[in-house]
Amino acid sequence: MVSADNRLTQRAWYYTEVFTDPNNENVVYVLSAPALRSIDGGKTWERLSGTHGDYHDLWINPDNSKNMVIANDGGAAVSFNYGKSWSTQSIMPTAQFYRINADNLFPYNIYAGQQDNTSVKIASLSLGRGSIGREDWTYSAGGESAFLAFDPDNPRYVMGGSYLGNINLLDTHSKASTKVLTAPIQYLGRAARDMKYLYNWNAPIIWSKHEPGTFYHCAQLVLRTRDMGMTWEEVSPDLTRNQDDKQGNGGRPYTNEAVGAENYGTIAYMIESPHEKGVFYTGSDDGLVHITNNGGESWQNVTPKGLQECLVNAIEVSPHDPATVYIATTRYKFNDYTPALYKSTDYGKTWSNISSGIPQGSFTRVVREDKDRKNLLYAGTEKGMYVSWNGGQKWESIQLNLPKTPILDLMVHQGDLIVATSGRSFWILDDLGLFRAYEKPQMAAKLYEPEAAYNGFWYSAMNGNSPSFKGSQPFTGVNPANGLVIYYELPKLDSTEISMEIRDAKGKVINSFSSKGDKGYKRYDGGPPPTPKLPKSQGLNRFVWNLGHAIMPGVDDIYIEANYRGHRAIPGTYTISLKVGDKIMQTKGVIKEVPSYDTTPGQYETFDAFMTETEANLTEMHQMVNGLFKAKNQLKKVLEKVDDEGLKKEGKTLMDEIDAWDKEMVQRKSKAYDDVENFPNKFTAEYLYLINATDSSIPRVNQSSVERRKELDAQWSGLKQRGVALKTIKIPEFNKKLWAAGIGAVQL
């Protein structure tokens, strides 16, 4: 014997690994719950610290033993100083999530147990922020292997599990919990056959959609509580194969392994029918499927005929048909990596294998049906994601930018597909509307109806249309795009310009876009941004309308401290028109109100009317300023050709009048950022400031804005009158005199 240190072999079944330093035969590493090192050939051992725990692999640089990479349940870490310190794992998206649940709040939250950590609750969107950060997630009920259950409309109380039947009920308001075990028995170290309740590592817990306040929890049988865990009752017999020869001590012949992960003969999944009260299905880790249609009073074995012993990892009741049910099974524990999805259309009486198209090796863990489009299925496998458009007759990969990693669970929720991975955290596919509308590629152009958008404020790297962004960013999660995400297909590329218009319910144009972008746009400091350009590529195109009204014009080469973007369109239904050549396609786009915004009836409409009129006024002002400034410059050139002194003097007087008006409207000395501190704002800058000061996340027109606009509108009335007179009377009259003198006129 080299060492009697129990730490070396305490959980040999799970993770004990031995590594020798390639540069020193007396340096040995043993990975277990701790990472241990001996520098004297195993006589004494020291513990490496600085990373997570539960160690599985180690790489030692053969040219430099100080450089190591270690892997554990928290990710990977790098050391360059012989393990004295390690790189942080907190910035690495390496979480392993088992089972997904989500609430119905906005933004909705995702819940799951995270391997060797707490359970997690994380927002799907960070309102008012640019990305999903640490402030958007917290712990939830249960532990690392938790199923989490709650009323999705009121998720104050969350019931979460952990291994060996540990359950607690978390009050998210008080941030306190109570333990609600079905039987508070210490099972650690016991043989499975000696356990009253034999729990799966991921023992199912579900909240009943049809019985308020009722939760179900599964061991080898089903238990129910109707009083938040105060009492539990058995509502099924043993629904497993109950094989005694597989219920001994785990990990033998080396060490006993009895922490729950190795339990066998347990219920691995339970689901309630969304259509019918009292209808539940269970699936066991040894290959049995059962159904009850009377709330557990009686159960029927509906296991597919000929199904071998396997893990029934997920069950899905079709959201479109009460009699249709899907199961995802796997036999990887038998070294069989064959995908095996099954479908029944008669409550499990008969089954068909629907795995065609999923390659060998991609064994199946979960299948879900889309909530809007019947027969649109999503499957998560050991090697990635698959989709079927025809109820499982044929599958194809939809890996896209998703890391190639095991998919442990899927959930279709609020128009999104939420993905739980083994080692690459949560991912969300936001654009299920496109999947729901998809048909085989056509030769003609096609415009798809976008998913509804919320009129909320947040930033997202998904707002742009650049193909270079791959859907992830360092350190933080990615917010979904803020706006209507519009997809369209183009059959071929040519010189034809494509254009898009957005109209409100009254038919008024809110904004418009073109594949040629802003013709004649000029960029300068303190000026407006360009109007986004419509992408134009053969095949599928993606364009995000940020819900904004048209960008207001600026005044060339004048710096105004302001935002020129139009205010955001208010909740309602809008018409989207796409013109490709002579063909015009239309669809609708829906904007929803953010539920958490405190608004009153008519508030959005009042805000929209105020902002629309104010922005229209500013647009008119700047158009007039630009037009008269252009006319003044033309007049200056024309006067250089005039010999008649009287006519020249009259022209100079007209120029001075235009210039005086212009100086009241804009500050032409302001050319750069800090110039606004040196030169006072003029009229349009004040007006634009009012627009920006009134625009806000929660639409509200304060009395101060109303009063300020009255003041400015009174000033504008006089300025506009003078400008119109210059444009329609004085310049045209002088033009007549120029024509009479045989000199070209000023163009307006």
Regions inferred by a protein language model and the residue ranges of each:
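Low-complexity, Pro/Ser/Thr- and charge-rich linker/hinge segments at domain boundaries
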Residues: 434-460, 588-622
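Contiguous beta-strand segments within globular domains
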Residues: 460-499, 503, 542-544, 615
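Mature extracytoplasmic or organellar-lumen-exposed domains after removal of signal/transit peptides
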Residues: 580, 587-589, 622-748
